Design a protein with these regions (language model features):
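Repeat-blade elements of multi-bladed beta-propeller folds
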Residues: 10-14, 56-79, 106-133, 168-192
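Acidic, proline/glycine-rich low-complexity intrinsically disordered segments
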Residues: 10, 17-18, 44-46, 66-69, ...
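Blade/loop signatures of beta-propeller domains
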Residues: 1-43
Length: 200
């Protein structure tokens, strides 16, 4: 039996797999918007990284996910935080330490987002890291899923079809997408030098 998704949940980068980017909420309207106030703020765990590993980052383009009232959000360095969406209380932080493998060579460090997956019982968050890892994280514990890949990790550096290239030229331009038993991970490669006056 298919479970009903709570109104207000935002389980994928675009809201749903249709990427409709719509939530049927009506508490905030054009008339009361000017009265809104900041309820809580969250300090990114990236700020606690050692200085030599805190690489320059690009624009923050990830979208927080909401699943049953819990917010899951990633940082540009690839850490995932679970937060109480009402209070902002930090429930757990998962750090894949992918930044230890170095930054991209021709672009700022950026992690575009995370993906929620469930089979109706098991619930996971997927992230494709800058270190070319696909990681499955248990949303209850914040720990890698030991039943996925190699203790929660899949090495995405395998079977590229090319023998020689600089691994740090490859980045992920979008969050992974998980459908059924398949996880789709896109990537892009900078195979030429990037300059301000380079053509688009």
């Amino acid at each position: 039996k298919k479970k009903t998704i709570p109104i207000g949940d935002w389980r994928h980068h675009g809201g749903s797999h249709n990427s409709d980017k719509y939530a049927p909420l009506d508490q905030i309207t054009g008339s009361n918007f000017p009265q809104l106030e900041v309820v809580w703020r969250y300090r990114s765990p990236d700020l606690d990284l050692p200085e030599d590993l805190a690489y320059p980052t690009g624009d923050y383009r990830a979208v927080p996910l909401i699943v049953n009232g819990i917010m899951y959000v990633n940082s540009n360095h690839g850490l995932i935080s679970a937060l109480d969406s009402t209070t902002g209380e930090e429930l757990w932080v998962f750090d894949p330490k992918s930044y230890e493998l170095g930054p991209p060579l021709f672009s700022p460090l950026q992690t575009r987002g995370i993906e929620y997956w469930t089979d109706g019982e098991i619930e996971r968050i997927f992230i494709a890291t800058s270190g070319k890892q696909l990681v499955s994280v248990d949303i209850q514990t914040g720990q890698p899923d030991p039943n996925f890949g190699n203790n929660g990790y899949v090495d995405l550096k395998q079977n590229f079809g090319r023998l020689e290239f600089e691994m740090n030229n490859i980045t992920h331009g979008a969050p992974p997408i998980a459908v059924g038993s398949t996880v789709i991970v896109g990537s892009k490669i900078y195979d030429f030098s990037m300059f301000n006056r380079s053509p688009p």
